[in-house]
């Protein structure tokens, strides 16, 4: 498979001499969407890719198509994340890159349509899955001398989402997690960043895609988001979030600093 060539704007921020060839990569939520497309891109660049997903049939098919490996993984279970990392290390001798991408829509509201089971499922997959993924990946990357972790957040992690506050809550959690963990593990040459796409052409918008189109809201192509993902994987930065919008290059979101405390007047 011939790898897609990076645009010059993406290459500028890459680590000197960074290549995906022979890198060991683990991708959760790898059976479809961003996970599958990123796996295909990296495999085309010569990486050794493990796709992890709870959907076994679709995951195995995706792995076969890109020439990678598959392991069934429920990211709600911390032991499953450890097993996925161990599988990658066993197959390819280590772990260089982890793309923590598993995610779902909420399926319930905050009050009238609130459902405790759906709420917990969304929080476990979208937020706990990233926590467990980092927890499992960091020790393996330490043994490798460093690595890169990218977590899928969302524009919902950067702004208010009145129609799905629970989804916004777990995606804000992912943003806060990578911003806080990134500077800590950067000291060990392990970079942790987040990717925050807008409405993209994946299954997560299937229930309201028609409405978006009718309102004239552009749907982002999956490959455009993958551009931003692979850019972050190769970037020297850590603790940052990049957003992806239709018609714009993926770019860093600039958070405002909170003013410091003011000393009390004597």
Where does each model-flagged region fall?
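Conserved mid-core segment of classical short-chain dehydrogenase/reductases
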Residues: 13, 105-120, 163-166, 206
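Canonical Rossmann dinucleotide-binding motif of NAD(H)/NADP(H)-dependent dehydrogenases/reductases
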Residues: 17-49
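Catalytic Tyr-X3-Lys loop
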Residues: 112-131, 150, 174
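Active-site-adjacent segment of SDR/Rossmann-fold oxidoreductases
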Residues: 159, 168, 180-190
């Amino acid at each position: 498979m011939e790898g897609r060539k990076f645009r010059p704007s993406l290459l500028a921020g890459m680590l000197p001499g960074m290549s995906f060839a022979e890198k060991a990569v683990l991708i959760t939520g790898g059976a479809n969407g961003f996970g599958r497309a990123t796996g295909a891109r990296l495999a085309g660049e010569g990486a050794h890719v493990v796709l992890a997903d709870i959907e076994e049939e679709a995951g195995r098919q995706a792995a076969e198509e890109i020439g990678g490996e598959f392991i069934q993984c429920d990211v709600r279970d911390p032991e499953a994340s450890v097993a996925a990392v161990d599988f990658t290390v066993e197959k390819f001798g280590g772990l260089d890159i982890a793309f923590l991408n598993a995610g779902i829509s909420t399926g319930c509201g905050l009050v009238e349509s609130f459902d405790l089971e759906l709420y917990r499922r969304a929080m476990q997959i979208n937020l706990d899955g990233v926590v467990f993924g980092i927890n499992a990946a960091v020790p393996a990357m330490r043994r490798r001398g460093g690595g890169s972790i990218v977590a899928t957040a969302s524009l919902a992690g950067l702004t208010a989402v009145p129609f799905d506050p629970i989804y916004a809550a777990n995606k804000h959690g992912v943003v806060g997690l990578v911003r806080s963990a990134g500077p800590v593990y950067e000291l060990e040459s392990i970079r942790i960043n987040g990717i925050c796409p807008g409405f993209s052409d994946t299954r997560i918008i299937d229930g309201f895609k028609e409405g978006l189109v009718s309102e004239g809201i552009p749907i982002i192509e999956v490959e455009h988001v993958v551009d931003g993902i692979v850019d972050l994987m190769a970037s020297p930065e850590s603790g940052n979030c990049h957003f992806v919008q239709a018609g714009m290059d993926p770019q860093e979101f600039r958070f405002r600093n909170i003013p410091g405390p003011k000393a009390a007047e004597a």
